[in-house]
């Protein structure tokens, strides 16, 4: 069944200025509405390298919900376990500046509780033959528990990402059961109740190694934008992965693509976490 991706679907509404962006002022621009959501993005990214993932999630019982399913199927994602329910999709509204960076965003989360029943009814079918599991950690606690239970039952590795660290912080006890957790520098600061925004990669690497060891988290990767990424394992192994220079057009989904690549590498390729992060 390949990699199973579990999480929420969002509709992204994005605004781009036509001239110099004025914070707090009126800006003429253009608007885009696209399918989004961390896990949906991850499933599509994995499918784009021909790995045929399975997406487990919810969509609205509407034409927009069917559009999401149709697009995933066009990318060869297995959509058998997507359930149509009222309020099945969230909304993410973001404003971008002239550099392609998000200057402000607000999101409305969907009701993901129907996933609990879906996993209870079809969990064995979903997880028994999968290669690994990519999990959005800020789902309902019961959904995370169910996923980890099935992973243990069938001996599957679980890799986790977040879309809202404020919610995911309430799930931090589960991180000891996650084979690799990926987040950005700001999210890592929230997780460990500290401010890491000023840290350079060398210092971030040392701090992360200490935190991962003390919290007994098996493996963690922290992305740092243009500074690259750092990783650490509970056994003391850690390192820095320099960034590759690219022309930025839109940073939306960059972290999702990084996570998808990490999951693909850890699932399909027998190389170490440094080479995977590259």
Predicted segments, located by residue:
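Glycine-rich phosphate/adenosyl-contacting loop at the front of the ribokinase-like
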Residues: 1-58, 63-67, 74, 92, ...
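Conserved phosphate-binding/catalytic region of the ribokinase-like
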Residues: 3, 194, 198-278
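A glycine-rich helix N-cap at a beta->alpha junction
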Residues: 71-86
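Conserved phosphate-binding/catalytic loop of the ribokinase/pfkB sugar-kinase fold
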Residues: 84, 94-132, 137
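Structural alpha-helical scaffold elements that stabilize or flank donor/cofactor-binding regions
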Residues: 125-126, 173-174, 213
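Conserved beta-alpha-beta core of the PfkB/ribokinase-like small-molecule kinase fold
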Residues: 132-204, 227-229
